[in-house]
């Protein structure tokens, strides 16, 4: 691989780096777990957990994926199954996305280092539009 992670949260570290292919490998492995696929396929995801002090807590995460918040629409004949977003000043706006075509074929798409979130989703839609060209 061509990745080196210094932390689990993904925030900037000068020795923290990855590639689109390595993100694909990680994402491809993660979708084998129903907890992950459930979480990436919803507008919000709530968990209850027991902390080290024995207390139970509930936490809800809300989607930042524009396809789930309604701020972006994928091309025709492309269904967004779910994805993982990430944005830092150094990395830019990033998105790993799992989509499907009308025939049930799955596609992984990854955009990294977009200048803005609007650019990220414009670039992603350009990439996803290739799915329709493949079907011609």
Residue ranges and their predicted role:
Residues 1-136:
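Penicillin-recognizing serine hydrolase domain
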